[in-house]
Amino acid sequence: MPVQGSQRRLLGSLNSTPTATPKLGLAANQTGAWCLEVSIPDGLFLSLGLVSLVENVLVVAAIAKNRNLHSPMYCFICCLALSDLLVSGSNMLETAVILLLEAGALAARAAVVQQLDNVIDVITCSSMLSSLCFLGAIAVDRYISIFYALRYHSIVTLPRAQRVVAAIWVASVLFSTLFIAYYDHAAVLLCLVVFFLAMLVLMAVLYVHMLARACQHAQGIAQLHKRQRPAHQGFGLKGAATLTILLGIFFLCWGPFFLHLTLIVLCPQHPTCSCIFKNFNLFLALIICNAIIDPLIYAFRSQELRRTLKEVLLCSW
């Protein structure tokens, strides 16, 4: 839990590492006058977290309510929403505790605050890892549904999906605990960066392959109906735009955070890197924005889920 400036101590002391002058030997003016620090107000942090929290709670509630949505695909979507919910909730909790401590409204011993911070860090880190894993799992599920359509229901069964979900959660908690314990080791940070890049490559390869198959299918239909080529080109451009948006949002929201981790290893004392470190809160805000966008991309496009969501909202009133 931070007490130095406005930087949050997410993931152990990770974000305080760049600002800890004694450890890095950086003078306050070493970053230079050109350094741009984007300040994220606590109110904005809480607002983004609240929007994400409400969105993802609604997704989980809708999937839990409708038995027609109890399928492997929606199982992964539900777990993605739960991961995003935990990301937002843990950041909101940390921000609230920080504000209470700074205002003197919450009195606690340093040891208690440290333990609370460690718990929040583990929850945040494990939910981030699981969120990335479930994004990959959704991509794999969609890939199988397209390229192995006839065998899909025998390959992707609900018990298998549940085992995958359990494995992801266990692995996420285990590795996040190790990460918090050994956050100051370069190898640990590099492993996280490699994991992010692996998920990015996996999603890019699968979705590009799916787009290529969809374009071939559209071209075949166009030839059967003797349509002109521009119609097929229009479909390809639309699909490429959708793919660019999907992968672009993923990279834009997650990339800066993992760039932060990479620079901690490569250039912890360089003035330029130190300038980037000052925007850690911005990188966290982008991840929370991703938690807001995920339901719009993966959940709310489903007509069945939207119908169930209306029922949930009507019942709540």
From Swiss-Prot:
Belongs to the G-protein coupled receptor 1 family. GO terms for cellular component: plasma membrane. CDD domains: 7tmA_MC1R. GO terms for molecular function: melanocyte-stimulating hormone receptor activity. GO terms for biological process: adenylate cyclase-activating G protein-coupled receptor signaling pathway. Residues 1-37, 94-118, 184-191, 267-279 are extracellular. It holds the Pfam family 7tm_1. Glycans are attached at N29. This is Melanocyte-stimulating hormone receptor. It comes from Colobus guereza (Mantled guereza). It comes from the Eukaryota. The lineage of its organism: Eukaryota, Metazoa, Chordata, Craniata, Vertebrata. Interacts with MGRN1, but does not undergo MGRN1-mediated ubiquitination; this interaction competes with GNAS-binding and thus inhibits agonist-induced cAMP production. Interacts with OPN3; the interaction results in a decrease in MC1R-mediated cAMP signaling and ultimately a decrease in melanin production in melanocytes. It is a multi-pass membrane protein.
